[in-house]
């Protein structure tokens, strides 16, 4: 098989992303594949500005921030055992996983 697998993890909670990345790296290393990462990608911040009042007081505003955290993991010289281990892996529901082969 011996192909490169790229895994991108994305979440709004950095603890979930780090724990999931650590779990994936441990699983892949146990199967004997070579792992590069987890590589932290830039944090994407979305800032929302909202008026506090509905009618007057335009100067009074409130800001909310939504940060998304990303990690990148590359797996080299993977085998069928590596792919099976990744398929059986349980990850938290707050983490988006994107896999490219």
From Swiss-Prot:
One of its GO terms (cellular component) is ribosome. Gene3D superfamilies: Ribosomal protein S10 domain (3.30.70.600). One of its GO terms (molecular function) is structural constituent of ribosome. One of its GO terms (biological process) is translation. HAMAP family: Ribosomal_uS10 (MF_00508). Involved in the binding of tRNA to the ribosomes. This is Small ribosomal subunit protein uS10. It comes from Phocaeicola vulgatus (strain ATCC 8482 / DSM 1447 / JCM 5826 / CCUG 4940 / NBRC 14291 / NCTC 11154). The lineage of its organism: Bacteria, Pseudomonadati, Bacteroidota, Bacteroidia, Bacteroidales. The gene is rpsJ.
